A protein has these predicted regions:
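Helical hinge/lid and interdomain linker segments adjacent to catalytic or ligand-binding clefts
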Residues: 32, 37, 41, 71-81, ...
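Extracellular/periplasmic catalytic domains that process cell-envelope and extracellular macromolecules
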Residues: 114-117, 158-161, 223, 372-374
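Structural recognition of the beta-strand scaffold that forms the well-ordered cores
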Residues: 123, 167-168, 230-232, 378-382
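Extracellular ligand-binding/catalytic regions of CAZymes and related secreted enzymes
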Residues: 29-35, 41-72, 250, 349-355, ...
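N-terminal export signals
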Residues: 5-25
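Hydrophobic targeting/anchoring helices
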Residues: 26-134, 143, 383
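Catalytic beta-strand/loop cores that center a nucleophilic Ser/Cys/Thr
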Residues: 134, 141, 238, 249, ...
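Alpha-helical scaffolding within the catalytic cores
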Residues: 105-109, 153-155, 364-367
Length: 428
């Protein structure tokens, strides 16, 4: 197939209609570079263009550490149109320019990683989730990356196996309604949360919401153990580990399950079941919207609350450690911090195998961590919304068209594309 016929085929059928029988060697085709440095006009939508290219069966490459983590895709009319309609800057590059780029990559701390398969994405969220509930949902919608919302019935029913990538956000897997029950009593959104969770627990055969959430946490752990990719932010990071560690312990306040917390709960927690954390101490006060001492910032804990600073992304060896390198691709290395119910993770609460991707220099906490579990991987990112640092309940959802270059949201979208990369054994 000649290039003219290749372009005509894509233009006639659209990106998604491109036939998988295309046999022209990828590297012989003219290419489009999607720069991800300061030349890019919309960093976030650029991820969507790359995602849709591989979703159509086209070969793409992620150029790690090259101009902010750029993408290389085939030069086709449909891809040019997609980029133009979304305000994404592309640069046509001929074979000579590509050869020059590859030479620079080979000689530097860079790498070219093939992106082979668009991951099937699931977002765990209750049906009544508010617009300010989930920064990842907003990022996916803005970038134009397709996803499916799932909740407890799908997890308990085993549907997670249908998805490559799962996101968790503002979910309290201890079943205590984010410990808002007493603080926000009487608020309609809280009443809806309690009613929907209680009804779902009964429907699925659990006596209490905490029992249901523990089972959901175990289902998610099994999903990762069997090869799934998990990305969690905010409350979900801390509470899923608490729920896993408390599989045989009552850690929920009386308002959540009708019984008090086990007074010896701290000593009975089984951290071997957790993803990231160990040795945490619970916050037993039902009036304090904090779960444990895992979170370094304690945003709702009065005198324990810590001010926001900035976190710095680590530099990794792209050729030796491609996975953490992918997760930190950015056009900024230092990023302003942002609160969440869980904002950060105390370093002395991390399991030894956790890789720190970003930290606040000189602070006892870290921001962004990653590791493997079984055949899969997990990544935890503290905080709620990178462009809403204070994040108050009831705030309007962030308008990402006002933040097209958000470095914090780029970290979210790195995680979406990471499962698309051709698997390669980590060398360290």
């Amino acid at each position: 197939m000649k290039r003219r016929e290749f372009v005509k085929t894509i233009g006639a059928y659209g990106i998604a209609g491109l036939l998988p029988s295309l046999t022209v060697p990828y590297r012989l085709l003219p290419s489009l570079l999607i720069p991800m440095d300061d030349a890019q006009s919309d960093h976030l939508k650029a991820y969507g263009v790359a995602y849709r290219a591989i979703q159509a069966g086209l070969k793409a490459e992620w150029l790690l550490n090259y101009r902010g983590g750029s993408f290389l895709i085939p030069d086709a009319d449909a891809l040019r149109r997609d980029a133009a309609l979304n305000g994404v800057r592309t640069e046509p590059v001929d074979e000579g320019a590509v050869t020059t780029i590859r030479g620079e990559i080979e000689a530097s701390n860079m790498d070219a990683v093939p992106l082979e398969k668009a991951p099937k994405v699931a977002v765990y969220a209750p049906p009544n989730a508010a617009p300010w509930y989930d920064a990842v949902t907003m990022a996916l919608q803005y970038a134009g990356i397709s996803f499916t919302k799932i909740w407890d019935p799908q997890v308990i029913g085993g549907a997670l196996r249908e998805y490559d990538w799962l996101h968790l956000h503002h979910e309290d897997f201890t079943g205590q309604y984010s410990k808002f029950f007493l603080i926000y009593s009487g608020m309609p959104w809280l009443a809806d949360m309690v009613q929907s969770n209680s009804q779902m627990a009964r429907q699925l055969g659990f006596q209490t919401v905490p029992d249901l959430k523990k089972a959901v946490a175990r289902g998610i752990r099994s999903y990762v153990d069997n090869g799934g990719f998990l990305f969690a932010m905010c409350t979900a990071t801390e509470t899923i580990d608490l729920a896993l560690a408390a599989h045989n312990v009552d850690i929920a306040a009386t308002f959540a399950d009708g019984t008090p917390i086990d007074p010896d709960a701290d000593a009975k927690l089984d951290w071997s079941q957790a993803f990231a954390f160990t040795g945490g101490h619970l916050e037993p006060n039902p009036l304090i919207a904090s779960f444990s001492d895992i979170d370094g910032h304690q945003v709702n804990a009065g005198s324990r609350r810590q001010p926001l600073g900035a976190f710095k992304l680590f530099n990794f060896s792209a050729k030796i450690d491609p996975v953490p390198t992918m997760l930190v691709q950015n056009h900024r290395q230092v990023i302003p911090d942002f609160y969440g119910l869980t904002t950060s993770f105390l370093r002395n609460r991390l399991k030894p195998g956790a890789t720190v991707l970003a930290e606040e220099e000189g602070a006892p906490w870290v921001k962004y961590i990653h590791s493997d579990l079984g055949k899969g991987t997990w990544t935890f990112f503290g905080g709620h919304d990178p462009e809403d640092p204070q994040h108050q309940i009831g705030d309007p959802p962030t308008d990402l068209s006002l933040h097209p270059h958000s470095p914090g949201y780029r970290l979210i979208l790195n995680n979406v594309l990471f499962p698309a990369a051709k698997k390669r054994e980590l060398k360290t």
